[in-house]
């Protein structure tokens, strides 16, 4: 049984996995996150094996980041959250935005849990809460990109009902219907 509560800008979920909550990312947190995210995404592009990104990865990552978040933390149709554990510690960042490719679909823009909290159910709990949030905002589907060199993430998405709809070699696009 999952209990979801929405209080102002705080969301929380509890079930047998983990008690977590979300708060909307603020401008200061976004500034730190943006620097990390561009670097991290560039590294993933390189690891995905696409040779064209070897020398242009950082530029490509920054360009894509700016397309997604043109107004920073306040970008329209984007919901970026800090994930907090039971003790209120900041343990990750997760978010989605309106898909530029499909009508009525939420596209996951970030899903990262700090290493020391991985493998303990926090990622799954955050994904469940993110889906509930998107569903509450009227989205019928959730879509995401998953790099193939991240098998733990791929397995988590698959176990949570996401299906591969496109394969790009180094990454796949996965989706899940949010409505019954």
Language-model regions, residue ranges each:
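Terminal substrate-recognition subdomain of acyl/acetyltransferases
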Residues: 2-15, 173-180
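Short polybasic/polar patches that bind polyanions
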Residues: 118, 135, 158
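Conserved beta-strand-loop-alpha-helix junction that forms the acyl-donor binding cleft
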Residues: 114, 118, 144-153, 170-175
């Amino acid at each position: 049984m999952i209990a979801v509560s929405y209080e102002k800008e705080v969301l929380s979920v509890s079930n047998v996995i983990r008690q977590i909550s979300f708060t909307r990312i603020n401008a200061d947190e976004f500034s730190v996150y943006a620097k990390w995210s561009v670097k991290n995404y560039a590294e993933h592009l390189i690891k995905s094996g696409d040779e064209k990104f070897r020398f242009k990865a950082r530029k490509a990552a920054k360009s894509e980041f700016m397309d997604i978040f043109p107004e920073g933390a306040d970008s329209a149709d984007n919901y970026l959250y800090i994930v907090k554990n039971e003790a209120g510690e900041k343990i990750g960042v997760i978010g989605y935005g309106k898909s530029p490719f499909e009508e009525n679909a939420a596209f996951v823009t970030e899903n990262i849990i700090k290493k020391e909290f991985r493998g303990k159910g926090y990622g799954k709990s955050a994904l469940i809460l993110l889906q509930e949030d998107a569903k509450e905002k009227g989205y019928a589907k959730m879509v995401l990109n998953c790099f193939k060199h991240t098998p733990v993430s791929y397995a988590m998405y698959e176990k949570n009902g996401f299906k591969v709809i496109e394969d790009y070699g180094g990454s796949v696009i996965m989706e899940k219907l949010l409505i019954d």
